[in-house]
């Protein structure tokens, strides 16, 4: 759970986004918040026995603090419930946790990054939540269909049209650097990049 402190509640709920990401991965069983015996937002509030009772193996939690007009500080911790300690520790044996300072429109990106940290820590495989997908839609016009190449967050949010054409397009593919897209087109040019 992520505890919010402030006057201006952001549109994006980090807990919901992280939960949805991890659920969609098919690798995690998530507990609904109404089954939590406690709701920590800081390490000193964690009572491991509460989480062991309901058979939780890992606990992700943090805070979202409003520190200015549309400015938020997000703090994220991940703990191993059965070992009774933070997942990440420094050489000095102190907990390593993550902190971001962002505007409200960047909270969804932070939630995707948190999801990636959790996924990697618990599975050993890098997460792909803070990535984008590309897809093509076809809209039926009054005379001819319109094809559109769209880029969106991995969960489908923040979709943006990057190309609209009356000629058919298909097979969008990311360049290895992840910054460019290639596609097959059936117009004047056989292929394109954007």
Report each predicted region and the residues it spans:
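Amphipathic beta-strand/beta-sheet edge segments enriched in Tyr/Trp
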Residues: 43-117
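Pro/Ala/Gly-rich low-complexity, hydrophilic intrinsically disordered segments
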Residues: 90-97, 107-148
């Amino acid at each position: 759970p992520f505890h919010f402190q402030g006057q201006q509640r952001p549109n994006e709920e980090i807990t919901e986004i992280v939960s949805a990401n991890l659920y969609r991965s098919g690798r995690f069983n998530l507990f609904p918040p109404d089954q939590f015996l406690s709701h920590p937002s800081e390490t000193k509030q964690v009572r491991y026995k509460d989480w062991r009772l309901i058979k939780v193996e890992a606990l992700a939690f943090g805070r979202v603090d409003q520190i200015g007009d549309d400015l938020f500080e997000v703090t994220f911790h991940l703990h191993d419930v059965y070992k009774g300690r933070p997942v990440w520790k420094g050489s000095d044996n102190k907990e390593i946790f993550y902190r971001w300072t962002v505007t409200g429109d960047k909270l969804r990106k932070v939630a995707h990054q948190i999801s990636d940290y959790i996924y990697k820590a618990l599975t050993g495989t890098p997460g792909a939540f803070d990535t984008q997908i590309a897809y093509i839609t076809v809209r039926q016009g009054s005379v001819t269909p319109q094809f559109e190449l769209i880029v969106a967050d991995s969960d489908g949010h923040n979709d943006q049209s990057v190309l609209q054409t009356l000629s058919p397009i298909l097979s969008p593919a990311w360049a290895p650097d992840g910054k460019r897209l290639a596609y097959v087109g059936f117009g004047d040019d056989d292929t394109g990049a954007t």
